[in-house]
Amino acid sequence: MINKNLRKLKFLLIKLFRIKENAHNVSLGFTLGFLIHFIPSFGMGPILSTVGAKLFKGNPIAGFISGVALIWLFPFLFYLNVVVGETLFPYGVFPSATGMPSHGLDAGIHLGAVFFIGMIINIMLFGMVVYYLIYTIMRKYRLSFLTIVKKWEIKK
């Protein structure tokens, strides 16, 4: 099982580093593909990653690779949105609507607002960090990584 996942990782890394475009376009596509996972996309993440990368003039292949390779991160990123939003705006900060008959509705509206604010903050923060990391890796380590990959053997 682990060897199968390592082979998939190796394949996706090779595909990413062999893209014949400049580092900016590849890192932009990868970053936009990654940022889709902060938004609930209901199974459309890889498609939205590709379309988003193409729309913002990034590399759509890099967007698809990050959309497929990092789809398992969605539950953690969803929870991170709620945690960041709740840290910045704890319960009781948003004014409740007057005359609301249910306390549950108030809590649901608060949770939605907290999630949305956390999502916006996380997208901006992680967008800058991931773009910088991928750009640096593509500029400095692309060729050396591709020569190392030739020697990288994973047992079946």
Question: Predicted regions span which residues?
Answer:
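Juxtamembrane non-transmembrane "cap" segments at the membrane-aqueous interface
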Residues: 75-100
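Membrane-spanning helices that line or support transport/gating and their immediate boundary helices
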Residues: 79-83, 87, 132-140, 144
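Residue-level signature of transmembrane alpha-helical entry/exit and packing/kink sites
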Residues: 21, 25-29, 59, 63, ...
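Short, membrane-exposed interhelical loops at transmembrane-helix boundaries
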Residues: 93-113
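Small-residue-enriched transmembrane helix starts and helix-helix packing motifs
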Residues: 12-36
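Transmembrane helix boundary and interhelical junction motifs in multipass membrane proteins
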Residues: 38-52, 56-79
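Transmembrane alpha-helical segments in integral membrane proteins
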Residues: 117-139
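Membrane interface segments of multi-pass transport proteins and intramembrane proteases
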Residues: 94, 138-155
